[in-house]
Amino acid sequence: MLWTPLRFGKYEELTLPEVVLRDPNWFFWQCGKSAFGGGDLAREAGWIRRQARAIKLPLENPNLSEVEYMFDRNGKLRHVTVVNAQHNRPADSGSIFRKNIDLSVPHEVGKQDCNGGQVIIEFLKRFVFCDEGITLTTEICEEFFDDDDNFDL
């Protein structure tokens, strides 16, 4: 897909795949404000929004696993991991569980959680891209979102 560069804000000239993998909180905040207007950018934002909430676990048998998002007492995301879907969840553990990787979780749960977006991107780099030190270039970000196999839609 030919992605449209932003023409506003702190991520001007970046495409939405880059933005959501750089700062998911900012992306979802802008979606909530309908900041992407109409036209191509709005369509792309809607598509990226759906994809970013449904990233498949890159496992041979993903139905046996789920993503655990662990929060501190203040509602800030502190850790993300993959756990066995059959494990017993302690009541009131401060965690939420999802079938897929959902980049919107830090924004949806902790509205003022500036660090949560980075926590989830670090997890994504480690677990999906298998490289904590990877630089998520324009090409890598766009190729990731262009590949439907990465998403459970």
Language-model segments: what does each one mean?
Residues 1-153:
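Accessory DNA-engaging acidic/polar modules
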